[in-house]
Amino acid sequence: MISQKAKYAIKALMYLAEKPQGEPVRTIDIAKNARIPKKFLEHILLDLKNATLVSSKQGVLGGYYLMKDPENINLADIYRLFDGAVALLPCASYKYFEPCADCEDVEKCRIRHELIEVKKQTLVALKKVTIKNLIGRRSS
């Protein structure tokens, strides 16, 4: 299940994507229009900035803006940033691999092999959904 933090990140990115490219948007405006608690949003925007998905400009006319084209930001990127591995078990993850305590041989485990396929298909589906797709759906 996607976390509330990841969902808010998606909403914030969608809001920024609807603004002119490179035009800073104040945190309070993002919070109000995307209906995200401001304090929570500040942490999310910092994570997005550290991941180079957004950048910020200081000052009276400052705020946050997208660093990537909305077409190049997908749900897999956001999910991994905020929620970690997509795999349902640690043994099915490449990045966070950890054998199950009750498994004798991970290479022969049929459950693991099926869950690796589920993870692959989930990643394909998440990568297909971009911020651009989402703002297109919302406005139609």
Mark where each language-model region is:
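Short amphipathic alpha-helical interface segments
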Residues: A9-Q21
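A short alpha-helical element within helix-turn-helix/winged-helix DNA-binding domains
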Residues: I28-A34
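Basic amphipathic alpha-helical segments that dock to polyanions
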Residues: I44-K49
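Residue cluster at the C-terminal edge of the helix-turn-helix DNA-binding motif
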Residues: N50-L53, L81
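Beta-hairpin "wing" of winged helix-turn-helix
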Residues: L53-V60, Y65-M67
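Non-DNA-binding regulatory cores of transcription-related proteins
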Residues: M67-S140
